[in-house]
Amino acid sequence: MGIIDTRIPDSKRFISGVTGDWEVIIGMEVHAQIISNSKLFSGASTKFGAEPNNHVSLIDAAMPGMLPVINQECVRQAVRTGLGLKAHINLKSVFDRKNYFYPDLPQGYQISQFRYPVVGEGKITISIGPDPNGQFEDIEIGIERLHLEQDAGKSIHDQHPTMSFVDLNRSGVALMEIVSKPDMRSSDEAKAYMTKLRTIVRYLGTCDGNMDEGSMRADVNVSVRRPGENFGTRCEIKNVNSIRFIGQAIEYEARRQIAILEDGGVIDQETRLFDAAKGETRSMRSKEEAHDYRYFPDPDLLPLEFDQAFVDALAVELPELPDDIKARFINKMGLTPYDASILVAERAIADYFEEVACGRDGKMAANWVINDLLGALNKDNCAIEETPVAPSQLGAIIDLIKEGTISGKIAKDLFEIIWNEGGDPRQVVEERNMKQVTDIKAIERAVDEIVSNNSDKVAQAKQKPTLIGWFVGQVMKATGGKANPQTVNELVKVKLGID
């Protein structure tokens, strides 16, 4: 049975070659390590960073006579992930042995699921943009399946000049392999897909998504074709461990295949590796087919069966997911899709924003969280969990602005003080005399002084009203930024005789 093409060709995503346009076809197999205290079939710890071969049971080391026992928590996490992907949950699935030899695979086979996975078809919606008009395009990427499998160990080649070592701490750790349909048509779509998938599993608490630790990695399948033609021969780029590298690997591989085809060559179906230092892919081995692995049901494990009540109970307990929160931010708080997307990228950021926005203007809260808080966090290379400004403190700053106690400019200074020194914003304003000047007569005196000292600019302003901004700036400077900007603007217009 052939793969069905569900996407209509889109010229915006075509790649221009010497002999015409090409379309890149992308599918991904993402390996996500399940958050669980113990491994898929043993009680050994899954904690990251231990000394080599410290978290290894007799089962993980494939000692004779050791039988696997399924970890129920891993099954529960896989089903929760399937529900988060709007996927069909299979009440009966089967574990198979995937046979191949590699030094870090002590059993000589991997326990996986082939014909009957625990999770069937689902979908993820990604947003691409904004375009020059500020619009986003929503694209649905199909999920073909999600199955459970064991991770292999780790081969270490850089510790000795003539020997390699094997660390089995990772051997037997539970993985979800999430297989997409070949629905992506650009590196941007692939990066958006990986980002969205990582966000979903983090919201669900089923995988930490830490690609730098290897707990989430992608095998990227890339092929090219002329628009409207059948799919071309695909190459698989193995174990890409960052979203940026996924984009770079696809860009290089698509160009490589196009160059071969335009020279009259043929694409070999093969497995390739991405060399991040060189920004290119290189051949690793010929690509295996399913029959090469000689799959057969694992005789040591019964079929995995559970009832619909088990699935329904997990569905009820699911947290609110990014798409739902984003829709709520847009529809109930009036945020733009762009701002809402930034705020839901991480659960901790969404929670922080909601606390700040509670009882306040949502747009104003979003501006402060996105521009000021996240800007400061990025500058100091901190995560949201490390912020020195609590939601209550940022909320208090916004309240002071809305009350007219401080101006927007003073608020920026106040935020910096709270960021560096902490404290109650309201108390800091009192102690440091940061309240904005609202006394009309005091502001009027400052305006009169600026106007009388700049008669040449007064004449220019009547011909060029945009110079009003210069006068407002001078008054704000003269008052130390404490004057109410709206009042200053109105008084300047009156004094200059400009409507």
Curated annotation (Swiss-Prot):
It comes from the Bacteria. Coiled coil: none annotated. Keywords: ATP-binding, Ligase, Nucleotide-binding, Protein biosynthesis. Its EC number is 6.3.5.-. SMART domains: GatB_Yqey. InterPro entries: Asn/Gln-tRNA_amidoTrfase_suB/E (IPR017959), Asn/Gln-tRNA_Trfase_suB/E_cat (IPR006075), Asn/Gln_amidotransferase (IPR018027), Asn/Gln_tRNA_amidoTrase-B-like (IPR003789), GatB (IPR004413), GatB_C_1 (IPR042114), GatB_Yqey_C_2 (IPR023168), Gln-tRNA_amidoTrfase_suB_CS (IPR017958). It is an enzyme of class 6 (ligase). Gene3D superfamilies: 1.10.10.410, GatB domain, N-terminal subdomain. GO terms for molecular function: asparaginyl-tRNA synthase (glutamine-hydrolyzing) activity; ATP binding; glutaminyl-tRNA synthase (glutamine-hydrolyzing) activity. GO terms for biological process: glutaminyl-tRNAGln biosynthesis via transamidation; translation. It catalyses: L-glutamyl-tRNA(Gln) + L-glutamine + ATP + H2O = L-glutaminyl-tRNA(Gln) + L-glutamate + ADP + phosphate + H(+); L-aspartyl-tRNA(Asn) + L-glutamine + ATP + H2O = L-asparaginyl-tRNA(Asn) + L-glutamate + ADP + phosphate + 2 H(+). Heterotrimer of A, B and C subunits. Allows the formation of correctly charged Asn-tRNA(Asn) or Gln-tRNA(Gln) through the transamidation of misacylated Asp-tRNA(Asn) or Glu-tRNA(Gln) in organisms which lack either or both of asparaginyl-tRNA or glutaminyl-tRNA synthetases. The reaction takes place in the presence of glutamine and ATP through an activated phospho-Asp-tRNA(Asn) or phospho-Glu-tRNA(Gln). Belongs to the GatB/GatE family. GatB subfamily. PANTHER family: GLUTAMYL-TRNA GLN AMIDOTRANSFERASE SUBUNIT B MITOCHONDRIAL AND PROKARYOTIC PET112-RELATED (PTHR11659), GLUTAMYL-TRNA(GLN) AMIDOTRANSFERASE SUBUNIT B, MITOCHONDRIAL (PTHR11659:SF0). This is Aspartyl/glutamyl-tRNA(Asn/Gln) amidotransferase subunit B. It comes from Bartonella quintana (strain Toulouse).
